[in-house]
Amino acid sequence: GIDLTPEFVSTGQRLCDWVGLGGQVSLTQGDATAMPFSDGSFDAAFMLHVGMNIDRKEELFAEVCRLVKPGAVFGVYDVMQTGDEALDYPVPWSSTPDTSALASHEHYIDALEEAGFDLIRMRDRREFAAEFFAETRRRMEDDGGNPLLGVHIAMGESAHIKIRNMVAANALPRNFCALACSVVANALRIGVKVSV
């Protein structure tokens, strides 16, 4: 795995070590648009809540396509904007609009195809994610604060505000695709198959 934030990499590696996966998982600090790996290094790849922080989706997906073997599957699970409503900040991935790079699922698909991926399927995960954040918010309110373990550890002291803003954004008519949308594509560079 790769992350731009050194603290996330070191924490992730410690967590892998704690659960006995340290020898099977390697995390690297670096730029996801210029990764330090050889062409065709990976049999598959996935991206989980990354694209909302990277404005240059075309560069990102071209880099992933370079790194995976032909025919490899690439899964994406990101927050994608589907409406024109303004978003209240902070949100889980960004404290301010200038560090947020939300894009539509159409933009993701175009960038994936331009990079050499063929879309296998796209699935709207709005309801799943909305329920998760609503339940997280309810638990935080019921418990009078943060539980011992939870998303607040990664989100910091403003976790309750970020979660509140995501719940509110998801209540807007079709403003966000799921809070997350999953996209699966492969690096075959042949015809496009789409099923939504």
Task: Give the ranges of each region predicted by the language model.
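Short alpha-helix
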Residues: 100-122
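A short SAM/SAH-binding and catalytic strip from SAM-dependent methyltransferases
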Residues: 43-56
